[in-house]
Amino acid sequence: MGLNVLDFEKPILDLEEKINSLTSIVHSDKKSKKNVNAEINRLRSKSIELTQKIFSNLNAWQVAQLARHPRRPYTLDYIERIFNDFDELSGDRVYADDKAIVGGIARLNSRPVMIIGHQKGRDTKEKIKRNFGMSAPEGYRKALRLMKMAERFKIPLITFIDTPGAYPGVGAEKRGQSAAIAKNLRTMSILKIPIICTVIGEGGSGGALAISVGDKVNMLEYSTYSVISPEGCASILWKNVKKAPIAAEAMGITAYRLKELNLIDSVISEPLGGAHRDILTTSISLKTQLLLDLTELDSFDEKELLNRRYQRLMHYGYC
């Protein structure tokens, strides 16, 4: 069993390994095919039933673990499957090109759009290159440049959020991390184009907010959105990181809880077992939601679009 398996996934993976073993027997021993196939079908039914049972009772901490799953799809995975003709744009024109944020122009069906998203890494080398999805000021300045470009070209802005938070290093602070985030918040609130934001994994604090002020804010079913990580909250409140599961429940970090609080617009369903189990199906669901949102936002003129966004921001914090 690989290292990329969460504790609550292990019973499911045990069954799947048995199914794979029996499948290899069928290929090598034709005589026992009938009996083995019957057992395979029984185990598959049991696997589906077990997965449904486990995933229908996930707590907030388990959802947080899924949001960070090593095999969970990242921004570039969705760009590859949802959009056409993606042309990546790099650099902030001030300091450097931050690989923790990717962006560029693409087509959603035939419509030009601007895409901005956090990008994590798969292996050690890429994780370091992408700084684990934690952007420095130059990343947010790059995002700001692309936002303004989208407004100039009058094309919709689509963002994908997946970060544990903005990079907290001394160098990032010296280069103006808080100011870079603040400028993005201000700019996104007044951009004269439709903005659709989707949390696809971790939505961590100001690092997430810096590209998530929009006309529509959606979350994938097993993503999270919070002002601090459960571990960070537990460390501050109880001086004990082991109380992270309690913090996760108390903070209300899950998509369905945030929908109840009217902090997001839609929860996008994931396949049974999570997005990493079926990236294509997740991409189709995400694309469908993006097209629905764009169709709705297209019905508003510029003045109405900005007024609705303003009212949305002003109502945060009200029940």
Curated annotation (Swiss-Prot):
One of its GO terms (biological process) is fatty acid biosynthetic process. It comes from the Bacteria. Keywords: ATP-binding, Cytoplasm, Fatty acid biosynthesis, Fatty acid metabolism, Lipid biosynthesis, Lipid metabolism, Nucleotide-binding, Transferase. PANTHER family: ACETYL-COENZYME A CARBOXYLASE CARBOXYL TRANSFERASE SUBUNIT ALPHA (PTHR42853), ACETYL-COENZYME A CARBOXYLASE CARBOXYL TRANSFERASE SUBUNIT ALPHA, CHLOROPLASTIC (PTHR42853:SF3). Its main location: cytoplasm. It catalyses: N(6)-carboxybiotinyl-L-lysyl-[protein] + acetyl-CoA = N(6)-biotinyl-L-lysyl-[protein] + malonyl-CoA. Pathway: Lipid metabolism; malonyl-CoA biosynthesis; malonyl-CoA from acetyl-CoA: step 1/1. NCBIfam families: accA, AccA_sub, PRK05724.1. GO terms for cellular component: acetyl-CoA carboxylase complex. Acetyl-CoA carboxylase is a heterohexamer composed of biotin carboxyl carrier protein (AccB), biotin carboxylase (AccC) and two subunits each of ACCase subunit alpha (AccA) and ACCase subunit beta (AccD). Belongs to the AccA family. This is Acetyl-coenzyme A carboxylase carboxyl transferase subunit alpha. The keyword tRNA-binding does not apply. The keyword Magnesium does not apply. The lineage of its organism: Bacteria, Pseudomonadati, Pseudomonadota, Gammaproteobacteria, Enterobacterales. Its EC number is 2.1.3.15. GO terms for molecular function: acetyl-CoA carboxylase activity; ATP binding; carboxyl- or carbamoyltransferase activity. Component of the acetyl coenzyme A carboxylase (ACC) complex. First, biotin carboxylase catalyzes the carboxylation of biotin on its carrier protein (BCCP) and then the CO(2) group is transferred by the carboxyltransferase to acetyl-CoA to form malonyl-CoA. It is found in: Cytoplasm.
